[in-house]
Amino acid sequence: MGSGPIDPKELLKGLDSFLTRDGEVKSVDGIAKIFSLMKEARKMVSRCTYLNIILQTRAPEVLVKFIDVGGYKLLNSWLTYSKTTNNIPLLQQILLTLQHLPLTVDHLKQNNTAKLVKQLSKSSEDEELRKLASVLVSDWMAVIRSQSSTQPAEKDKKKRKEEGKSRTTLPERPLTEVKAETRAEEAPEKKKEKPKSLRTTAPSHAKFRSTGLELDTPSLVPVKKNSSTVVVSDKYNLKPIPLKRQSATAAPGDAAPPAEKKYKPLNTTPNTTKEIKVKIIPPQPMEGLGFLDALNSAPVPGIKIKKKKKVLSPTAAKPSPFEGKTSTEPSTAKPSSPEPAAPAEPMDTDRPGTPVPAVEVPELMDAASSEPGALDAKPVESPGDPNQLTRKGRKRKTVTWPEEGKLREYFYFELDETERVNVNKIKDFGEAAKREILSDRHAFETARRLSHDNMEEKVPWVCPRPLVLPSPLVIPGSNSQERYIQAEREKGILQELFLNKESPHEPDPEPYEPIPPKLIPLDEECAMDETPYVETLEPGGSGGSPDGAGGSKLPPVLANLMGSMGAGKSPQGPGGGGINVQEILTSIMGSPNNHPSEELLKQPDYSDKLKQMLVPHGLLGPGPVANGFPPGGPGGPKGMQHFPPGPGGPMPGPHGGPGGPVGPRLLGPPPPSRGGDPFWDGPGDPMRGGPMRGGPGPGPGPYHRGRGGRGGNEPPPPPPFRGARGGRSGGGPPNGRGGPGGGGMVGGGGHRPHEGPGGSMGSGHRSHEGPGGSMGSGHRSHEGPGHGGPHGHRPHDVPSHRGHDHRGPPPHEHRGHDGHGGGGHRGHDGGHSHGGDMSNRPVCRHFMMKGNCRYENNCAFYHPGVNGPPLP
């Protein structure tokens, strides 16, 4: 129908001429027209409308006409489609229509409608649909039973007529036709079964029936014989030809037709006894089951086939005694023909032999059933009457020769078993070993032959004669426009160049000497004499970065060392001069190729050399106090990084408390007393209980060595190098602790120091300090009475906090809480600074030999000058 929505009322109006008032189809012609419209219906509305029209029709002739024109097949297609799409309403409508149609068994056999309905009755999800399908199946079963009960009587009459005809007409038919017919029937049976298996099963089957059923009811044999054969034929749809043979063999008194007796000559006595046993044995056991009926009755034609196959195998192997020279005659699979003068075909089968003599053997009429006596027929014997039969009802075999002109000579060649074998396939290990020996011998001979080959020309080279070719009739590409097209194309496209090599050899290797990478110092020498960059910051702003950004490209040890040496050149303190980075490295590392690090450490003058080398350049401690100010102060060396005065910003002088004078805030406090080790605090260290500006303090407090390379009067690197981890900033002492009354470090190692006014910061950990208090290396300071600023404020003892790692870009600054007097805490981004004194641990040999260690600050051993004081 159309693609748009369908109105059933409009459809019924169009069909009004074919329908009555009740919706029933008027005539037979109308149902044909409606069926043609039903075939075109694609929408569910139109299909349901047509199904309801069929349901309203009551006239049987109209319904029969609907089935005949193809309505039943159409309903089958609709049923299949609706079952696939699981359309329950359409399925119910189709089942009602099928129930309404007068279907017969022949109709049900036409397609799989019955099977689909039975599946719906069992496996449908809808309960109403299952009930409807089961009702329809039961109705159809009743139709099948009623029709099958009326058919057996008619079948019996037909079979009796056919049996009578076969008995009367069989002797009159030519013998060759009978043989051809029996052969055509049994040809598929030959292909399916092998003669040996048939030969073994036949006697066992006969024995089963003879032993089990003979003792029960032998007197019922003549009564049940005919009835059983008829019932079995009805059940199993046996063909009439096996039934003819059954009936022919069933009557022992009748004269057997020649087709039946042709199987008996070679094995007469046992076969006849078996057949007699089969006839005597009742076909049904005492239970009377249908399966045993089939066992007893169905194999009767099968036994005939088995007998024939038994005969086939001995005759195929029998030699034909003609002339004593010809080979066997195995033409058993070829159907026989009545003409005696067709000699070429039976000899085409596979058989070994020599050239066949000129005398040609005619085809045997039936090689499968030939008797030994018939094979002994003499060549002189004339072909007698074709209708003449032997005493057993068989035509006598005769041998004739064709005329001289029709004689042919055939040559047969024996088939070699290894002719079609893959010779390259190895069969066993012996052959593989033999082949291996042959290949080794061949390789040896080839090598010996080629060893004396001087590769000289054996045949002199002769230039071949030049070929003289006629001039071409057509110049190739003379009229082609493609070259112009390509020329236009290449004006805007690069030409494709394929460069040929000068020679097929590999190119010469390019001379290349591996050169060790050049070490570029972190602080260049040319920039050291210039004044460091002064950055103007707000009071709460961040100070200079303790280390340059380039330090991350080198190991931290080398970066710190180089930064320290580079910074030491800038102020040019007393006794300071230019220093070479490589000299310091080689002096620290010694000669690792000649002496191991342990031997270097054991030398007595090793530490003295190190001190002499590092002290003049300000690497081991800060310079002396200039004019009472720390380095970088008003009287100190130039180039110290200054901070602008902030509100309440502490002064490094004696008044570092909240009431101190406003002045430039310097990062570097005055150095500690140099009474002890220049790298470690002596007895006068304010953090170890030494006297501060506020008075003496009690016993020593914990000390913690800060990371970094700078200290003393060395200024930090310029701000472009901010953001790296490590290095102390400001002028604090090398151990990272604040001096008396001053600030030690601000933000070393990238942590936020929480400072009060005048507070100082240790090695990169947070310290909460009171006014005038100084903080050690990130640990809680144990202070006695009298500590603090001039106003007597006791510092706030706060446990040390590990700093947080602010990982941001280097310019990122954190402004923190202001303490007493507004001093802010400042910090720089960078890595964690662990610190800690490792001098009591073994020296890291990798650090001593190579100058760096891959574990860096996480190493559990002592790195001199990094996680502890340098070696003395």
Swiss-Prot record:
A zinc finger (C3H1-type) spans 838-866. The keyword RNA-binding applies. The modification Phosphoserine is found at residues 313, 382, 545, 591. The modification Omega-N-methylarginine is found at residues 665, 693, 737. Residues 153-166, 174-196, 596-611, 795-835 have a biased composition (Basic and acidic residues). GO terms for biological process: negative regulation of cardiac muscle cell apoptotic process; negative regulation of mitotic DNA damage checkpoint; negative regulation of transcription elongation by RNA polymerase II; positive regulation of telomere maintenance; positive regulation of termination of RNA polymerase II transcription, poly(A)-coupled; positive regulation of transcription elongation by RNA polymerase II; protein stabilization; RNA polymerase II promoter clearance. Residues 583-595 have a biased composition (Polar residues). InterPro entries: TFIIS/CRSP70_N_sub, TFIIS/LEDGF_dom_sf, TFIIS_N, Znf_CCCH, Znf_CCCH_sf. Residues 147-213, 247-270, 307-398, 534-837 are annotated as: Disordered. Residues 1-348 are annotated as: Interaction with TOX4. One of its GO terms (cellular component) is PTW/PP1 phosphatase complex. One of its GO terms (molecular function) is DNA binding. Phosphorylated on Thr-398 by PKA within the region necessary for interaction with PPP1CA. Expressed in testis, brain and intestine (at protein level). Highly expressed in testis. Residues 357-433 are annotated as: Necessary for interaction with PPP1CA. Residues 418-619 are annotated as: Interaction with WDR82. This is Serine/threonine-protein phosphatase 1 regulatory subunit 10. It comes from Rattus norvegicus.
